[in-house]
Amino acid sequence: MGKKGKVGKSRRDKFYHLAKETGYRSRSAFKLIQLNRRFQFLQKARALLDLCAAPGGWLQVAAKFMPVSSLIVGVDLVPIKPLPNVVTLQEDITTERCRQALRKELKTWKVDVVLNDGAPNVGASWVHDAYSQAHLTLMALRLACDFLARGGCFITKVFRSRDYQPLLWIFQQLFHRVQATKPQASRHESAEIFVVCQGFLAPDKVDAKFFDPKFAFKEVEVQAKTVTELVTKKKPKAEGYAEGDLTLYHRTSVTDFLRAANPVDFLSKASEISIDDKELAQHPATTEDIRACCQDIKVLGRKELRSLLNWRTKLRRYVAKKLKEQAKALDISLSSEEEGDEEESAAETKQASEEEEEREEEEQLNRTLAEMKAQEVAELKRKKKKLLREQRKQRERVELKMDLPGVSIADEGETGMFSLRTIRGQQLLEEVTQGDMNAADTFLSDLPRDDIYVSDAEDDDDTSLESDLDPEELAGVRTHSDQKEQKSLQFAQVDDSKEEEGENPLLVPLEEKAVLQEEQASLWFSKDGFSGIDDDADEALEISQAQLLYKSRQKEQQPTDPPPPPTNLKTEKKSSQCQNEVPKETEAITDTGGEDRDSSDSDSSSSEDEDDWKVSRGKKRSRGSKADEDGFEVVPIEDPVKYRILDPEGLALGAVIASSKKAKRDLIDNSFNRYAFNEEEEELPEWFVQEEKQHRIRQLPLDKKEVEHYRKRWREINARPIKKVAEAKARKKRRMLKKLEQTKKKAEAVVNTVDISEREKVAQLRSLYKKAGLGKEKRQVTYVVAKKGVGRKVRRPAGVRGHFKVVDSRMKKDQRAQRKEQKRNHRRK
């Protein structure tokens, strides 16, 4: 029967599933994300202290949103699993030990943000739980005041209870701005709210009573008011009336209405407007409706009030025109002296008006230019947005494999690949040299960004291919490619004169092969390394002559020929080559002319010459030589010493021999003992030889620490991978990283898709990672030793989970015996 999960209080809501998908340790991480989205306190913080931080969801959010080099410290009663770039402490925030540990960790630093998401163990009673949480918040505030920098933030969780208001009052005394909020991720049925305190005042001294719960949460007794206090002693002054205004009815004239600076305010205070001027009363704009509206303004609506304002505007224009006419008539009647003064004042007025007009025109021009510039900037922004939108759509199409990068449906007839053979004549050559750079720029800008990485990937594949091949295989591949290039050059020399319309000025005919080889040889031998090659050739001749003389003397001293070495196909081939080369050497001894240089210029290496000489040594001895008469003293050539790889005991013994001559003499003297085994191993049985080596060996006076030191060095050397293995692992890692990047891009495209459901997204993501081979995990196999009397079918043993394999103890013994047999056979060889 299936086990029923905990679904009370809608525990598994969307934030629960989001925390599972995004990797947060708790759903409360989204509370901090939403608080930071509103108040923006994590982006500018350089140091953060998280109290009651387990299991570490808020620490994960802080590490994500804060700068990389920030200091993040988390404290809780229970241990917190390690997080990158986060320091965790297991302490009680109500104790002095926690304060000392924080001082040790922070040193002289002051934190910018203090977080507190702590809550006590609940379940006793609501009143007790609320008080415990308020007391815990007060202790967190006490720690925050010790380590918070000036202007820092303090974010804490508080339960809504009767202790909430005292806490809020204490926060307001210590911080500049205090706001209470409830993020969307907090459950509606929960009594928790979050208080964000910003702008820490950092007072020089804080009263200890603030952090004493007995004083902070003390109930204040409200004294009851007496009846005499409730009775008002003096009647308050009436409000809403202007001082000195004894009546509410105000009658005004039309002249006052026309002179009013604020006509709307004038109409709100007036009750009636009397038309006392005859000219204004006879004006065409003064209709019967206007007269009726002027009699009682308090009852007018918006439409009638607007008609009164329009009537006022017409009357003001009429009065202004009339005043101008009167001013002109008055100017005519002025005397000549007054006329001069008037002209000067008029000129000044005209000049001032012209300056005012110029200023207005300049301001208008500046406004027009600013508007045009703003329109141009808006147009550029619109074009840029459009271009970015098209590029994003193209990238999404490529990521979703709806379109291939670099493939266009348009015709590619004229925009094919460039070829020299298409240029025929001087005119086409000039067109190519001039070029169309604008077209090239537009072509490059139209290309998608994904095409940029194609050439790099191809180069990486070529380099990885060269690193995979051995030197011999690489040389063979290069030789094969050179032969192909030579064949292609030979075919390119064939000239089809009938099909060509003109001569291509860029195609140059190739020279003959012999001429090219001679030029390459002359360039090669003109290097500085071949400057003293003549002297080297003379020395080589002298050495070869000395070797021949020494061989002939050894041949005379030996009565019988040595047995011929075992020959195979390679040795026979080399011996035949050596027989052909012997006469050339004798000719080189007698004649040191141009042939000497030719023989020294051969491409064969010195190691091959030495091998050939060793193979043909038996045949040269049988021929004999007349070189004894020359009287050369030949020094015998010693065979190269074969170095033996020492085990840790041998290395320790060598260190003792190299460090002390006395120890060396003692070791040599002690080697002559009764355990010395001087018999020939071939004449004795193998089992006897092995037992003697195992049991009749005298222990060497070696230091165990020294032997262990060399054994450890050997283990370190053996643990290092060889170059080919390291390169193969690096190539495999590079391929996996490349595949992972491609899969991530596809996964982002799937996640950003809106048309499919979450279940379909998860299925597509699983298929993507399965195709990329990133979700494969090696299956763990548990080996279980079978007991006697157990049949073929074995039940799952107790305590074993997952895949298990039953093995036999007999199998272990057989494998041990096989290893011994292989070791024995290896010794025989």
UniProtKB/Swiss-Prot annotation:
The active site is at residue 157. S-adenosyl-L-methionine binds at residues 56, 58, 76, 92, 117. Residues 794-804 have a biased composition (Basic residues). GO terms for biological process: maturation of 5.8S rRNA from tricistronic rRNA transcript (SSU-rRNA, 5.8S rRNA, LSU-rRNA); maturation of LSU-rRNA from tricistronic rRNA transcript (SSU-rRNA, 5.8S rRNA, LSU-rRNA); RNA methylation; rRNA methylation. One of its GO terms (cellular component) is nucleoplasm. The modification Phosphoserine is found at residues 333, 335-336, 345, 353, 531, 544, 575, 659, 671. The modification Citrulline is found at residues 389, 766. Residues 336-346, 354-363, 456-473 have a biased composition (Acidic residues). It catalyses: a ribonucleotide in rRNA + S-adenosyl-L-methionine = a 2'-O-methylribonucleotide in rRNA + S-adenosyl-L-homocysteine + H(+). RNA 2'-O-methyltransferase involved in the processing of the 34S pre-rRNA to 18S rRNA and in 40S ribosomal subunit formation. HAMAP family: RNA_methyltr_E, RNA_methyltr_E_SPB1. PANTHER family: PRE-RRNA 2'-O-RIBOSE RNA METHYLTRANSFERASE FTSJ3 (PTHR10920:SF13), RIBOSOMAL RNA METHYLTRANSFERASE (PTHR10920). This is pre-rRNA 2'-O-ribose RNA methyltransferase FTSJ3. It comes from Rattus norvegicus.
